[in-house]
């Protein structure tokens, strides 16, 4: 499913040296600083490494976060702030608002910002995997799992760590509730797309497919309503994507609901449902063009050129023609003026985020190691010195080249 998913850019960050000269007064403390520097650099490299997989990402995130938590969590399990939490300044850009960075001298800001990028990596990994020419069933499961993991990371950051920030989150930026909610729900919607493709491939009950498509359309509508409250300059392209996906899955829902009605000998209602499917499919086609022409951050999906998209149009037309033929020969039922109300609830296949937890603090941290950081040795005028601004360069991301499209490949 090459270019089926819209992706915003990764967050970029300024280099961090963790050079606490004089403060890191023991060999163990200096080793912590060195390991923080190297594990952070390694994790940032993997974000743009096309060969990176789940295992590599987990190992890298565990290595860095298990060290970083020694700057945040209390070693004795208490609630008192760790003395090292505010020792280092961190700068991060935003996925939507370009290269103007936000900066906070707070290790929690680093934790949630890097964690946000980890979640984004899982979404991009899923998109890249779904774009393979001959995706296997196991790879399709990996796409599904990656999106659920990403949703779990976003949810965990929002509920457990972002509230701990001392500096309030700026409105419309990544860590704000509306933005992180939009990312979370989009991950759930995209994972359900994989479920729908699988259900179609295995020819499951049309009622189940209609219900799943309806739930997925509602997810995309929820994302769109959330984005509508943000600055349109930054989210116009993202909104076009969510709107076209909403219309596409509403078309799917009405199409398969029409099949269910036909099997229950309600041919007139089936025709009306298929007419509604045709209307939503037409809207989705128009929105595909609008999306492609809308400027904004992120990669551009190309769903209208995808066989999965085109198959839907053919299915709607063929099913509608079949219903009309059957009605002319057998049923002779009136077609209702109003489209049927979809009150569909999927009992199977709904996606929930995979619960996420940061790793435990590394055993390198001990009371002795912690004591090895002597904050009294910090230069007294440290904060008053004019510092050279570190440039925050955009994160390099691998190109995803379209491959031969052989249809509904994620199933």
From Swiss-Prot:
Bias kind Basic and acidic residues: ranges: 375-404
GO annotations of cellular component type: nuclear envelope; nuclear membrane
Keywords: Lipoprotein, Membrane, Methylation, Nucleus, Prenylation
Propeptide: 409-411
InterPro entries: BRO1_dom (IPR004328), BRO1_sf (IPR038499), BROX (IPR038898)
Pfam families: BRO1
First-listed, main subcellular location of the protein, grouped into a coarse class: nucleus
Residue span of region Disordered: 362-411
Cellular compartments annotated: Nucleus membrane
Entry similarity comment: Belongs to the BROX family.
Cited function: Nuclear envelope-associated factor that is involved in the nuclear envelope ruptures during interphase (NERDI) repair.
Protein name listed in UniProt: BRO1 domain-containing protein BROX
Organism encoding this protein: Xenopus tropicalis (Western clawed frog)
UniProt lineage: Eukaryota, Metazoa, Chordata, Craniata, Vertebrata
Protein's gene: brox
């Amino acid at each position: 499913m090459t270019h089926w998913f819209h992706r915003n850019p990764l967050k970029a960050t300024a280099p961090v040296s963790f050079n606490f000269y004089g403060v890191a007064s023991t060999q163990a403390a200096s080793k912590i600083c060195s390991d923080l520097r190297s594990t952070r650099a390694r994790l940032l490299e993997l974000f743009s490494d096309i060969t990176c997989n789940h295992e590599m990402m987990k190992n890298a995130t565990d290595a860095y976060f298990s060290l970083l938590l020694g700057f945040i969590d209390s070693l004795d399990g208490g609630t008192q702030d760790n003395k090292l939490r505010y020792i280092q300044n961190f700068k991060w850009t935003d996925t939507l608002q370009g290269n103007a960075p936000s900066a906070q001298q707070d290790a929690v800001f680093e934790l949630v910002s890097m964690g946000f990028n980890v979640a984004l990596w899982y979404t991009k990994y899923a998109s890249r995997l779904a774009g393979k020419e001959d995706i296997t069933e196991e790879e399709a499961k990996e796409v599904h799992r990656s999106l659920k993991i990403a949703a779990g990371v976003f949810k965990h950051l929002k509920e457990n760590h972002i509230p701990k920030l001392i500096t309030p989150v700026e409105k419309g930026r990544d860590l704000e509730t509306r933005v992180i909610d939009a990312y979370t729900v989009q991950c759930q919607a995209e994972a359900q797309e994989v479920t729908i493709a699988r259900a179609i491939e295995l020819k499951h009950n049309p009622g189940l497919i209609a219900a799943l498509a309806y739930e997925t359309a509602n997810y995309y509508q929820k994302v769109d309503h959330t984005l509508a409250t943000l600055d349109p300059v930054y989210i116009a392209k993202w909104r076009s994507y969510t709107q076209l996906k909403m219309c596409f899955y509403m078309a799917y829902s009405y199409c398969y609901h029409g099949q269910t009605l036909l099997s229950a000998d309600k041919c007139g209602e089936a025709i009306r449902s298929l007419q509604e499917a045709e209307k939503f499919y037409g809207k989705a086609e128009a929105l595909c063009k609008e999306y492609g022409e809308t400027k904004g951050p992120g990669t551009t999906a190309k769903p209208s050129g995808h066989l999965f998209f085109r198959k839907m149009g053919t299915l709607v037309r063929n099913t509608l023609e079949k219903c009309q033929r059957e009605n002319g020969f057998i049923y002779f039922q009136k077609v209702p003026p109003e489209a049927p109300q979809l009150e569909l609830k999927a009992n199977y296949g709904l996606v929930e985020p995979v619960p996420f937890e940061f790793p435990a603090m590394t055993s390198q941290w001990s009371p002795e190691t912690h004591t090895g950081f002597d904050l009294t040795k910090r230069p007294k005028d440290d904060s008053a010195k004019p510092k050279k601004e570190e440039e925050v360069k955009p994160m390099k991301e691998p190109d995803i080249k379209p491959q031969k499209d052989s249809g509904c490949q994620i199933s």
